[in-house]
């Protein structure tokens, strides 16, 4: 049975989070009574409030009010006063993934998994299904520019969701189709070992019903190995790999847009399909790979080649995924969520492919534990940047780890032979350096999952204050 509409008031603890806000918005649109709380105000909360959802700032037991159900994310600790109050009242306490799973149970669902690229791929799959008049429900881990939100109601039979592997709860999601973009060493604080991460993705794929299928990236060694071990589920492979069922080739960048072809070889029918001269208004081979996963799903669901072509060409992107925030004197400024070495490397490579100028990177390491666990990878992921600035670590509630801070990262990047890497303290340092070293045609790329996005939007305005010309533009 579906969640009864008369279940009563549903209270979200941490409602401002990107995943929680999307679920809350969809439930509200379905007619459920929703409220929530969070530690601080943000744009997600403002959007929910504009829809009539009551959101408390700060966590207090009294915030529960008349709530009959409480939804929490794994970030909510058992010492949270609202969690304690819910337990004392013997209210059902539901994890975020369980509530998402409830929404998925009564639709045909596509779950996008992988260490990197989930949000963009989810958005692309949604865009192609939308173009094909599937009218999907969507719950994403980022703001889809075309919708202005991370959630889309949709009245069709299909649902597209981002499957967050960080706490293992993605295994609860009942999907008919899954995507695995890549598998890297991440979230070891939860899993304990990389082998445990591998095993979770194996279960993710094998949870697909016999009538569904998995779409897996053959360019990633870990995913290729996993695909070879799946013998009781239908698997469609994709990537640049010549052996992929859905292969992209002839990639090039023109005017900040990716151009490529796709060759689809069906193992079921033996039919070969070519899609030539596809255009994606995004930079980077990694985004073409994500688009190829979306193409594989769309083709399998019967969406025509021309609709696929149109859907890709009109794709509006995702907020904080190589998002241009402004320009100054011909210097373009971008904001990106990349905070893992693999993501940073891919973003900087995309920037390098898109400009003939310099690439200037400003990175804010996210969590001391991640910096410690992946320290060697962080020292070598900035090779496509001409100038690197490392900001203080965004701790996200963690305590510092001796020997693994921004200062040590700068020192080791220098030891790895990068000639221009600098330790910075604040935005004013960035303004000083960029105004000195950057020239027209250069890219300035901010990287990180923390507060650095505020710098990315502030920099063009601060640079414009240095002079009184009219060359400034802000997005």
UniProtKB/Swiss-Prot annotation:
Pathway as given in its UniProt record: Cell wall biogenesis; peptidoglycan biosynthesis
Catalytic activity: UDP-N-acetyl-alpha-D-muramate + L-alanine + ATP = UDP-N-acetyl-alpha-D-muramoyl-L-alanine + ADP + phosphate + H(+)
EC supergroup of this enzyme: ligase
GO cellular component: cytoplasm
SUPFAM superfamilies to which the protein is assigned, alphabetical: MurCD N-terminal domain, MurD-like peptide ligases, catalytic domain, MurD-like peptide ligases, peptide-binding domain
E.C. code: 6.3.2.8
GO MF term set: ATP binding; UDP-N-acetylmuramate-L-alanine ligase activity
Name used for this protein in its record: UDP-N-acetylmuramate--L-alanine ligase
Protein encoded by which gene: murC
């Amino acid at each position: 049975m579906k969640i009864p509409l008369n279940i009563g008031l549903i209270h979200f603890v941490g409602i401002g989070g990107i995943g929680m806000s999307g679920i809350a918005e969809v439930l509200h649109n379905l007619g459920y009574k929703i409220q929530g709380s969070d530690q601080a105000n943000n744009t997600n909360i403002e959007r929910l409030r504009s829809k009539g959802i009551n959101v408390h700032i700060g966590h207090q037991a009294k915030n529960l009010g008349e709530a009959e159900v409480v939804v929490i994310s794994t970030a909510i600790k058992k010492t949270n006063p609202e969690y304690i109050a819910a337990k004392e009242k013997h209210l059902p306490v539901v994890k975020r993934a369980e509530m998402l799973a409830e929404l998925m149970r009564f639709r045909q669902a596509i779950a996008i998994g992988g260490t990197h690229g989930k949000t963009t791929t989810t958005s692309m799959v949604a865009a192609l299904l939308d173009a094909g008049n599937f009218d999907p429900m969507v719950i994403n881990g980022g703001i889809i520019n075309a919708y202005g939100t991370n959630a889309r109601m949709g009245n069709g039979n299909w649902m597209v969701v981002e499957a967050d592997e960080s706490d293992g709860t993605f295994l609860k999601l009942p999907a008919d189709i899954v995507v695995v973009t890549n598998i890297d060493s991440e979230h070891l604080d939860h899993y304990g070992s990389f082998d445990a991460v591998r095993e979770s993705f194996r279960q993710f794929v094998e949870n697909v019903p016999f009538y569904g299928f998995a779409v897996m990236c053959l360019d990633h060694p870990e995913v290729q190995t996993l695909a070879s071990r799946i013998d009781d589920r239908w698997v469609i492979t994709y990537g640049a790999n010549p052996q992929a069922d859905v292969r992209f080739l002839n990639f090039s960048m023109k005017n900040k847009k990716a151009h490529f072809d796709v060759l689809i070889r069906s193992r079921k029918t033996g039919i070969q399909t070519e899609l030539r001269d596809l255009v994606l208004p995004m930079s980077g081979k990694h985004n073409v790979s994500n688009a190829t996963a979306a193409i594989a799903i769309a083709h399998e669901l019967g969406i025509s080649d021309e609709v696929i072509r149109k859907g890709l060409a009109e794709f509006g992107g995702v907020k904080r995924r190589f998002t241009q925030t402004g320009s100054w004197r011909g210097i373009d400024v971008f904001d990106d969520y990349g905070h893992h070495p693999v993501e940073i490397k891919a973003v900087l490579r995309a920037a390098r492919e898109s400009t003939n100028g310099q690439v200037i990177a400003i990175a804010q390491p996210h969590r001391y534990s991640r910096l410690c666990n992946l320290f060697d990878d962080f020292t070598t992921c900035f090779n496509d940047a001409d100038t690197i600035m490392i900001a203080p670590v965004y701790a996200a509630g963690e305590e510092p780890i001796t020997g693994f801070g921004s200062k040590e990262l700068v020192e080791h990047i220098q030891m790895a032979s990068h000639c221009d890497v600098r330790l910075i303290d604040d935005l004013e340092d960035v303004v000083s350096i960029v105004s000195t070293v950057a020239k027209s045609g250069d890219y300035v790329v901010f990287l990180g999952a923390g507060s650095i996005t505020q710098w990315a939007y502030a920099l063009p305005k601060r640079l414009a204050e240095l002079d009184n010309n009219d060359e400034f533009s802000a997005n």
